[in-house]
Each structure stands twice: as C-alpha cells, then as structure tokens.
Amino acid sequence: MRLVFGLLVGACFGQAIDPAKVVDLTYPYNKDTIYWPNAQGFQHRKDMWKRTPQGYWYAAGEFSTDEHGGTHMDAPIHFGEGKLTLEAVPVSKLTGPAVVIDISAAAAKDRDYRATPADVTAFEAKYGHIRKGSIVLFRTGWGKFWPRRKEYLGSDVPGDTAHLHFPGILPEAATLLVSRGVVGVGIDTASNDYGPSVKFETHQVLSESNVYGLENVAFIERLPPTGATLIVAPMKIENGTGGPVRLLAILP
C-alpha cells in the first residue's frame, strides 16, 4: 500500500516518491482527540461490525465531529466575513513548499509564548526569504503533550476556555507572513492564537487575507526547516468553516 501511495503521489509531482519520505502529520480521530473545551468532540458509532447471516463480512458506522478539532484546517471564513469557505479553497493552494520555524526553545520557557516577526526574519536570515505560495508551520514542541488535555491546553475542564495556556503566533508575525504571500499557516498547538487569546487577532489577520490555518499539526519535528513539500487534503465540506484534514509531507 505504501508503495502504491508513493507511486500515486509521485505521479502528481512527475516522479516516483520513496514511501519512506512520506510523513503523516495527522493525528487519528478517536475518543482522545483534542477539541476546543466547549466543543462536542469526535463521536464514532459502529452500526454494524460483524459477519452477516449470508456469510460475508460487513462493517459500517457513522461519525460526527465539530469542524475544528484534531488535525484540521481553518477556512478563511472562520474569522473573515465573506472569505473562502472550506470547499472553496483553491486546489492550487493545497500543496506547496513547507517552511518550518522552530520556536520550541522559547515555548519551553514560556507556555504563552507567541512567535514574533523577529522569529520570522531570523529564520529568513538563516534559510532565505520565504517564497510566495509557501505553507509555514511553527514548531513549538507541544506535540509531546498530545493527547493529554491538561498539559496540551492548560486545562482539561469541559467548557473552560478561560484558563488555556499554550503557544501561538503574534498577529504582527502573521501580517509579515501574509506580506510574503504564504497560502497557509499552521502550528502544533490547538490554535494559531495563543491560549489566553480573547480576540483571536492572528486568526483575523490570516482570514482577512484568505490564508488558511492548520492546527494540531502532528510530528512537525520530523520535517527540515525547508525543502519538504506539503499536501493538504481537507474534507470537502460545502460552506464549511473548517474541517478534518489529512496532512502529508514529502521530504526532500
């Protein structure tokens, strides 16, 4: 199966892809999946999971989920009135060069750290100007806490949004990235805005420019600062404000 997948992806990029270079940046959806504290969460029911009277095996079920939970995409409409809904995000923006900015050292010292414009320009000084069409991911190191809600969010109390503490991105840094022409911005925490945010200014900046967000991104530490290619495959929900995404990286 991995070989077949590699060949299919390779066909899209004009060459065969070594399956060992494909990194899945997606957490599975299950009872442990982390959502915003006031969300319903993921529900999965096995309607039938057995051998039929006719002798053949049959498995089917149903699931329900909030749009924003687990590894997911924020469509621009999420915080931008009149902006793109989930199904309207152009396919051309669902693949692109990955840029990984590591702020894990600062986040380890301050749970509420927010990536700054200086973090972005320091990255560019070392690795080069962020190209138009890039998808920028911020590595905070928060994946080490998944799926332990209290450590990951700062609170594990259902409905409690007043005591959240995790790293995010300053709106000024988001503005700088928008000026670079990026198509998506993601992070390995529950939100591109930090935990204590009440106005979600970073979401507003990105949404107003039709830049999508990626949240709860898994295993960012497996990617190099530059050189990888991202494939972003969200569930195609009409008029969706967001939804589950299968996020893959092709290593250089």
Residues covered by each model-derived region:
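Active-/binding-site microenvironments in catalytic and ligand-binding cores
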Residues: 13-252
